[in-house]
Amino acid sequence: MAKVQAKMQGKAVGPEDGLREKMIAINRVTKVVKGGRILGFAALTVVGDGDGSVGMGKGKSKEVPAAVQKAMEEARRNMTKITLKNGSIHHKVMGQHGAASVMMAPAPKGTGIIAGGPMRAVFEVIGITDIVAKSHGSTNPYNMVRATLDALSHDRTPSEVAAKRGKTIEELFV
């Protein structure tokens, strides 16, 4: 199962409605009952439109395809919008969930996605093309995806910062 998961991690599953879909992890789970063990599968996926929208979903089922399908449907329902700046983020941000923490910084055009594991899949589906990211602490895929989405939710545009400070955008950059 670990070999199958390693091959499947971060692979595009196949969009039908213009959304980008990535499967991040598949785990075999066991429920112990009086008569023995019941085996099942849990899937973690992310879905994005390539233009700033992203959603995360989890699904469980007795079979892998059904678990992946449930996860994709949940990810579509949980989509949120992130503002991007020329294929990157506006400023350095940090996010945390559980013991997983991530740091992201904007990168100039042509840098590419410098990130590993589940973070790379999130950036690819959201439409980020240039970013530098580093994860610290836990490498649990579920917590890393949540920490990544938490960090992206803290990204503010210059107009949002100016409005909050009661200044104009020009006054921010003086």
Swiss-Prot record:
Listed Pfam families: Ribosomal_S5, Ribosomal_S5_C
Gene3D superfamilies attached to this UniProt entry: 3.30.160.20, 3.30.230.10
SUPFAM superfamilies in the record: dsRNA-binding domain-like (SSF54768), Ribosomal protein S5 domain 2-like (SSF54211)
Any one GO MF annotation of this record: rRNA binding
Protein's GO biological process: translation
Entry-linked InterPro entries: Ribosomal_Su5_D2-typ_SF, Ribosomal_uS5, Ribosomal_uS5_bac-type, Ribosomal_uS5_C, Ribosomal_uS5_N, Ribosomal_uS5_N_CS, Ribsml_uS5_D2-typ_fold_subgr
PROSITE patterns recorded: RIBOSOMAL_S5, S5_DSRBD
GO cellular component assignments: small ribosomal subunit
Secretion signal, residue range per the UniProt entry: none
Key words of the record: Ribonucleoprotein, Ribosomal protein, RNA-binding, rRNA-binding
Domain S5 DRBM: 19-82
Biological role: With S4 and S12 plays an important role in translational accuracy. Located at the back of the 30S subunit body where it stabilizes the conformation of the head with respect to the body.
Domain notes: The N-terminal domain interacts with the head of the 30S subunit; the C-terminal domain interacts with the body and contacts protein S4. The interaction surface between S4 and S5 is involved in control of translational fidelity.
Subunit structure: Part of the 30S ribosomal subunit. Contacts proteins S4 and S8.
The family this protein is said to belong to: Belongs to the universal ribosomal protein uS5 family.
PANTHER family tied to this protein: MITOCHONDRIAL RIBOSOMAL PROTEIN S5
Name by which UniProt lists this protein: Small ribosomal subunit protein uS5
Organism field: Albidiferax ferrireducens (strain ATCC BAA-621 / DSM 15236 / T118)
Organism lineage string: Bacteria, Pseudomonadati, Pseudomonadota, Betaproteobacteria, Burkholderiales
